[in-house]
Amino acid sequence: GFSAESQNSTVTSFSSDKAINFPYHEIRDATSNFSLSQKIGQGSYGTVYLGKLRGTDVAVKQMKDTKSREFLSELNMLCNVHHTNLIELIGHAVGGDSLFLVYEFAQNGALSDHLHKSSVRGKFHALKIDKNAGFAPFPWTTRIQIALGVAKGLEYIYLHIKPYYVHRDVKTSNILLDSNFRAKVDCRFGLVKLLEQHSKEIGTAASRIVGTIGYLAPEYVRDGYVTTKSDVYGFGVVLLELLSGQPALSRDASPENSQYVEHRSLVDYILSALDNDDYLTKLTQCIDSALSHYHEDSLFQ
């Protein structure tokens, strides 16, 4: 656990003009003493709880490893990231032998759920002005706005944060949506990696491949070098998901043998359509059937 000395040294090792140092009791009370009913996530870097802090819904992450130089370096960076299309670190607290990071909470959850989860898909309010209008899947204009928001968030990471960082895990489950369905890229600790070179195009050798199958750029898997182009590939897969409504990787049981599960890459699926003589017809068949109104020219672009 933390000693009082290590707690203080950890907190004072990073600074921010905006991050708030919350008293521990506020974090504890906000999460109902870290109740299991408030738990909304679990990852290699810690546990995430939903909390109500000073009248605002927040996501509270209880961190595991907080003593490494890499942790403090990335924490310093996150404290000073402020962009409307990135999940923002609001503040931190120390107590109960843990460090807690407080993030803004995205009320509408992950984009992946809205595209692929049957219990969530179709819960987009078609006409929010008319409360009786009912719900409908994401319209074309909303999907375009989400894609644009993600692009702006990633651009901010690449152009406005020094030294260079990349995300490493751009995917629909790391794209969160606020109450207005504005895209918020989740770049919480553990997702970004410092590029050791001075050029973001050169990249840095990864000690291990980090990311998600279906979103990994082939050259990253082959050579093990992380660059912004690795993220751009993942962003391209996100665009294909927005267009097709299909996940990046599908699991299909073989009709001959139900025990055999074949993984189909969305990228391969779309590329096979493009490789067809009648590719426009094939591509049209790849489009999400829930998209009833869209401009073909802009979609195929």
Name what the model sees in each region.
Residues 38, 76-79:
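Conserved alphaC helix of the protein kinase catalytic domain
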Residues 47-65:
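Glycine-rich ATP phosphate-binding loop
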Residues 2-18, 22-26, 59-76, 87-145, ...:
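Cytosolic eukaryotic protein kinase-like domains
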Residues 43, 81-84:
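Conserved N-lobe motifs of Hanks-type protein kinase catalytic domains
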